Every structure is written in structure tokens, then in C-alpha cells.
Amino acid sequence: MELLEMNCPYCCSPETRVHCTYQTQNYGPRRLYECTACFEYFSETKHTLLEDLKTPLSVVWNVLNARTEGMGLNATVRTFGVAKNTVLDWEQRCADLQPVLFLYSLVHQFLQVVIEGDEAYTKIAKNVPPDQSTGWTLLLIDRASRFIWTLECGKKDRKLFEQAIQTLEQIIQDSEDLTLLTDGERRYGNLLFEICHQLIRTGKPGRPSKTLKKGVKVRIKNKGSQAHHKGPKRSKYQAPWKEHPHTEQAVDVKEIHANHAEAFFSALRRKCATFRRRTNTYAKSTKGLQRLLDVYWVIHNFIRIHFTTQEVPAVSLGVIDRRLSVPELFQIHRA
């Protein structure tokens, strides 16, 4: 597996050889490598989560697993008898793997991708109106494999949606057919239309029409009553943005929903302490929430088996061949 290859951390060369072994207190013997390209020496834990880590790996994993199963930060500190800053350091080490694994996932090619988009809200720092809160979390999840592409938090504005659409743009470049399904939120499609469009030149006079790129489809399900809306009512299922004439339009009405994304957020409110309702908000921050979301992203996609597919989401999507073990995850080089 390419993720686990031993490359030089200085020049990224794969031409390395074992120089010697040395003994550690908690992890047994380890290897010291020599790069035959730049002649630098480095340990097998260089630039990994295990670098300068003296605590046994089982303790670190139990703490991270508890944090992604609903235990709060202070409760974790009391239960496992470790310092708060130590727990935060372990979380940050694991969160640093998110950009590495995300880029590794993007280099793969996909024939057909169906992505659901949804948002969830939690209070940050203090209780403010939802439109002013920075606790909105935006999710893009693959329907078939349950692989999470985007899990970003912040204020519900154009900047947050642009981050998700930039991810979609990269997926579009690596897939032949992409369908985006949302529950009434039109900003996904608006920004996607701005970024991923093309001009249809027919040779007729006038300005060429602008459409989504070939193979890209966006569908919206308008939920709830529209009795209080003035003017014409929107249909329940819509394709509000013009699509390429050669794009296959076969999307069943029954398939236009974001139920899997909503179910994910229902589970997240149990598995992530910052999303649990009726909790104190004095200890929450956007930075801390994003750090924990990145940890959850790594464990959900590459470690934890999903109960529906009975596979790790990354395996179901075809990103990796098998589930990563915890020691293997901790040996991946950080960004």
C-alpha cells in the first residue's frame, strides 16, 4: 500500500535501506533508516504520529476512540488520567493526517459518484442566533460507500460553501458522472454552477449558453410547507441549473433526498460531544470543533467499519484495498 511505504522525510525518495535497530521503552525495537539519495538518517517514526510519543499506543487509541464515541474532553481527562493538553496534542496529531488522506483519496478515478450535501448546527462559545453562529458544519458524503468528502465547520456563509464546492470540483475532474443531491439548500448548486460550468457553442448567433460540465447533475428536494411563501410555489423536486445536453438525466425521483447525510448527523450528535444538545457551550471553539471533526473524518473513513456496508468507507469507495489497523494509521507520514 502506497500510504505505508517508507520514503525519506527529507527528499521523499523511496530509495532507503535499514541502517540499524534501536530499543525503545514502550514500543520495543525500531529501525533507523538511511536514504541512499540524500544520505540522511531517520527513524521509522519520523514525521508520523508516533514521533516523540512516549505513551503506549493502546492508551492513545483508547483516548481518541472515546473522543469519537461521544465522551467530552474533561470526562476523557478524568477517565484516562491524562492531562488535557496531552489529549489535545494527540487529537492534533491525528487531525494532521486528514489532508494527507484526503489528497490520497482524490488521486483515484471514479466512474459514478452520488454525493449528498447537508448542514448541521451547534452552539459555539455562546448562544447566538443561528445565522450568526460559527458552529455550522457542512457535510458532503458519498451515498454508496458512506465516505465523507467534506466535514467543515464555520459560519454559514459563502466562504464555507466555497470550500465544499472546491472539493466537488476536484472530484468532478476524477469522475465521469457526478450527482449532487441536497435538501433545499441552493447555494451548493449556485457556487457549483459558477465554478464548474462550460459554454455550449452551437454556431448560432448570440451569446453561447452556459451549463454545468458534462456528467454533472444537481437535484434539490424542497421540503416543508410553502404556504407562507409569496408568488409561485417551487416544485418538490427540482433541477434548477441548466445541464449539459449530453449528460444522462436518469435520476429517479425517489432517489432525490439527503437521508443518509441526515442520518449521519443524527449519529454525530451522539458520537461528538460538541454536537450533543443541551450541553454547556463555554468550552467550545470553532478551532477545537474542526480539530475533532478532522479526527472523526480519519477514523470514520479508514478505521471504523460502517454497519450498513460492513466495510470501511475507504474500502467501499475503492481508495484502499483493506482496512487500516491502528498501528498502520499511526505510521503514515503527516503533512
Task: Give each language-model segment a name.
Residues 1-335:
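Residue-level recognition of single "structural anchor" positions
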